C-alpha cells in the first residue's frame, strides 16, 4: 500500500441504475470521472468492479453516503453503506463512506453549464458526482486527521 498522502483512491456514487466512478490521487487532491457502471436495482456487475480495481490498483475506496439534508440516514444511504461493506468483503480494500449531500445537484449544474440537455435518466451525471465526492473527501479536514 502507498504511503498516506500518496494513495490512489477510487470513489463510487452509488445508485440503483448506475454507479458513478472517479479516480484520484490524494497528494494532488484532484479526481477524474470514469465511465459509470450499470446496476440492476443497486446490484452492480461485480466482475466489472473487479476489472476496475485490477486496472487502477487503488489503495482506498470511497463510497458517497447520500444522507438526508438534516444528516439522518435514508434508505439510499443504508444501501450505499451495504455496497461499501460488500466492496470491502469481496476485495479486501479499505472503504470509507463520505457524506455526499449536494453532490448530485452540483453535478447537474456542472453538466448543464457544459451543455447537458437535462435528460439525466438516459444521460446521467454519476461520474461527475463521484468526482465531486472524491474531491470533497480529499479537501475534508477530518479525512486528513484519520489518515494512518
Swiss-Prot record:
An annotated Gene Ontology molecular function: nuclease activity
Entry GO terms, CC: cytosol
Segments traversing the membrane: none
Protein name (record): Putative pre-16S rRNA nuclease
Species: Chromohalobacter salexigens (strain ATCC BAA-138 / DSM 3043 / CIP 106854 / NCIMB 13768 / 1H11)
Disulfide bond entries: none
Location in or out of the cell: Cytoplasm
Known role: Could be a nuclease involved in processing of the 5'-end of pre-16S rRNA.
EC identifiers of the protein: 3.1.-.-
UniProt record similarity statement: Belongs to the YqgF nuclease family.
SMART domains named in the record: YqgFc
Entry-linked SUPFAM superfamilies: Ribonuclease H-like
A Gene Ontology BP annotation from the UniProt entry: rRNA 5'-end processing
UniProt cross-references to PANTHER family, sorted A to Z: POLYNUCLEOTIDYL TRANSFERASE, RIBONUCLEASE H-LIKE SUPERFAMILY PROTEIN (PTHR33317:SF4)
InterPro entries per UniProt: RNaseH-like_sf, YqgF, YqgF/RNaseH-like_dom, YqgF/RNaseH-like_dom_sf
Source superkingdom: Bacteria
Amino acid at each position: 500500500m502507498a504511503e498516506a498522502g500518496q494513495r490512489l483512491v477510487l470513489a463510487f456514487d452509488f445508485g440503483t441504475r448506475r454507479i458513478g466512478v472517479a479516480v484520484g490521487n490524494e497528494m494532488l487532491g484532484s479526481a477524474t470521472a470514469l465511465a459509470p457502471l450499470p446496476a440492476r436495482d443497486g446490484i452492480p456487475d461485480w466482475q466489472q468492479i473487479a476489472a476496475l480495481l485490477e486496472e487502477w490498483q487503488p489503495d482506498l475506496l470511497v463510497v458517497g453516503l447520500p444522507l438526508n439534508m438534516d444528516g439522518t440516514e435514508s434508505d439510499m444511504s443504508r444501501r450505499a453503506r451495504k455496497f461499501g461493506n460488500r466492496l470491502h468483503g469481496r476485495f479486501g480494500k479499505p472503504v470509507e463512506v463520505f457524506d455526499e449531500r449536494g453532490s448530485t445537484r452540483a453535478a447537474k449544474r456542472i453538466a448543464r453549464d457544459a451543455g447537458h440537455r437535462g435528460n439525466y435518466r438516459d444521460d446521467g451525471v454519476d461520474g461527475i458526482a463521484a468526482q465531486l465526492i472524491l474531491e470533497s473527501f480529499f479537501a475534508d479536514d477530518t479525512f486528513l486527521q484519520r489518515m494512518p
